[in-house]
């Protein structure tokens, strides 16, 4: 892809993000890539058939119009599914330290298992989603941003049948490329390493397809019984779970497994409270377990990932070397996720080998230019707003959610609602729901009230600006 095409693609993504909103964009378009640009057509790709079908059904016109705003001559946008790698299982006896350590959910392609062990019969019989043998605990890079998630996942994986279940469900959420899938597949591999427990890994897409297929073939009862007979259910990308009937079945399965003392592990790109498409009962059950956020990769962790990626590449390219100053430069400038870090090393490897040149800082600056993105605004959560406002006005968060009408509570509540409307993409009904189940008209009144006061009251205006700065830091 040329720099011109990359710039166009960045602008199109910006238009699309503005058009559909941050939440819809992160759910459906964050993993869409540009493959090629022709004079009158554009070729895009996504990783799954489900994403392709959903985007084509609901957003094809929107995507085309965003491209036509950039290139009026474009009349067609083609969307295809990127070829997925279906890997065999890892060697049971492979030592953990022999695997290069990664954190981005997609480790070095050069790594290969030295021996092949079969995937568990349960996983295959129930049509489990494909597992990558490189996504194990041994290849996971641990840093401050993921320590708790790793420790919780490890404890779940090391449990035995009949042990008390401590974290149920274990719910891990983070942005794209921060290691959620890596941890979930690591739990699956570790759980399947013996014959004692039945562990099943499914993407939300796979769960939907499996349930719909069972309904069509009139085998829904067998599908339900099989799922509820396993010991550990691992569900990835829960934000893609769609359809009332499917969600109801997922809720029943979740309740049945948890009530029976079986383990459930789930990953999504947002906390349970932000999964607005899910039924309130499901969100409540998910929030009742251990909810862990994997934060953005710190610079030290990014440097560790880069070093491990270089080590992995040397297994097949012994002369490949990246000087430490170059790695430090990459760690400082590529800040979004581990997949961009992997892409940077792949580019340096290709350039070095194809041109028979050593890797230099100048080469790195040139080759990764399009991976250095402007810093995106911090995503602010309503819970953060409530916490910061409560602290500022010396009230509790429960006061903000309560029905109390005393002056020392009403004003902070109105300020918090105003900030929720101005700093997030949440709708008025959603904001009202998050403030103790209030009506959207109550939120609208609060927003207009604070807007009017801020225009006249300098002290309140300064307070609101201070709160905004605290939330955006």
From Swiss-Prot:
Location of region: Domain I, interacts with DnaA modulators: 1-73
What is the protein's species of origin? Rhodopseudomonas palustris (strain BisB18)
Q: What does this protein do?
A: Plays an essential role in the initiation and regulation of chromosomal replication. ATP-DnaA binds to the origin of replication (oriC) to initiate formation of the DNA replication initiation complex once per cell cycle. Binds the DnaA box (a 9 base pair repeat at the origin) and separates the double-stranded (ds)DNA. Forms a right-handed helical filament on oriC DNA; dsDNA binds to the exterior of the filament while single-stranded (ss)DNA is stabiized in the filament's interior.
State the similarity comment: Belongs to the DnaA family.
Domain of life of the source: Bacteria
InterPro entries, sorted = AAA+_ATPase (IPR003593), Chromosome_initiator_DnaA (IPR001957), Chromosome_initiator_DnaA-like (IPR020591), Chromosome_initiator_DnaA_CS (IPR018312), DnaA_C (IPR013159), DnaA_dom (IPR013317), DnaA_N_dom (IPR024633), DnaA_N_sf (IPR038454)
Q: What is this protein called?
A: Chromosomal replication initiator protein DnaA
Spans annotated as Domain IV, binds dsDNA: 353-473
Region feature (Domain II): 73-129
List ligand-binding residues for ATP. 177, 179-181
Q: Which GO terms describe its molecular function?
A: ATP binding; ATP hydrolysis activity; DNA replication origin binding; lipid binding
One GO cellular component term, please give it: plasma membrane
């Amino acid at each position: 892809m040329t720099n011109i095409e990359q710039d166009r693609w960045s602008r199109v993504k910006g238009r699309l993000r503005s058009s559909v909103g941050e939440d819809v964009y992160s759910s459906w378009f964050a993993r869409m890539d540009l493959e090629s640009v022709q004079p009158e057509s554009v070729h895009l790709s996504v990783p799954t058939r489900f994403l392709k079908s959903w985007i084509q059904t609901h957003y094809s016109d929107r995507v085309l119009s965003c491209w036509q705003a950039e290139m009026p001559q474009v009349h067609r946008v083609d969307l295809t599914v990127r070829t997925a790698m279906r890997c065999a299982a890892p060697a049971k006896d492979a030592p953990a330290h022999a695997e290069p350590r990664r954190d981005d959910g997609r480790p070095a392609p050069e790594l290969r298992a030295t021996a092949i062990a079969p995937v568990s019969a349960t996983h295959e019989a129930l049509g489990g989603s494909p597992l990558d043998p490189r996504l194990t605990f041994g290849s996971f890079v641990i840093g401050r941003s993921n320590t708790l998630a790793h420790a919780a996942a490890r404890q779940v994986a090391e449990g035995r049948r009949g042990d008390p279940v401590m974290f149920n469900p274990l719910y891990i959420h983070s942005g794209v490329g921060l290691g959620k899938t890596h941890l979930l597949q690591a739990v699956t591999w570790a759980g399947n390493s013996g014959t004692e427990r039945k562990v099943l890994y499914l993407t939300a897409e796979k769960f939907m397809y499996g349930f719909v297929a069972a309904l069509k073939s009139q085998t829904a009862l067998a599908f339900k019984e099989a799922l509820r007979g396993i010991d550990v259910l691992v569900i990835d990308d829960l934000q893609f779970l769609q359809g009332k009937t499917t969600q109801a079945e997922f809720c029943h399965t979740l309740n049945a497994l948890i009530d029976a003392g079986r383990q459930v592990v789930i990953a999504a790109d947002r906390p349970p409270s932000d999964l607005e498409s899910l039924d309130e009962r499901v969100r409540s059950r998910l929030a009742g377990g251990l909810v862990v956020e994997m934060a953005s990769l710190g610079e030290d962790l990014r440097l560790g990932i880069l070093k491990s990626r270089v080590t992995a590449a040397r297994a097949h390219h012994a002369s490949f070397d990246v000087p430490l100053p170059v790695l430090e430069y990459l760690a400082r400038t590529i800040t979004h996720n581990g997949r961009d870090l992997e892409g940077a090393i792949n580019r340096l490897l290709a350039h070095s080998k194809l041109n028979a040149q050593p890797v230099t800082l100048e080469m790195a600056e040139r080759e990764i230019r399009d991976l250095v993105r402007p810093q995106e605004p911090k995503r602010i959560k309503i819970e953060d707003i409530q916490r910061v406002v409560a602290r500022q006005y010396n009230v509790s968060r429960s006061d903000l959610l309560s029905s109390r009408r005393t002056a020392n509570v009403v004003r902070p509540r109105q300020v918090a609602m105003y900030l929720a409307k101005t700093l997030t993409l949440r709708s008025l009904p959603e904001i009202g729901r998050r403030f103790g189940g209030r009506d959207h008209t109550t939120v609208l009144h609060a927003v207009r009230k604070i807007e009017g006061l801020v225009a006249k009251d300098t002290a309140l205006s300064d307070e609101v600006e201070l709160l905004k700065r605290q939330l955006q830091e």
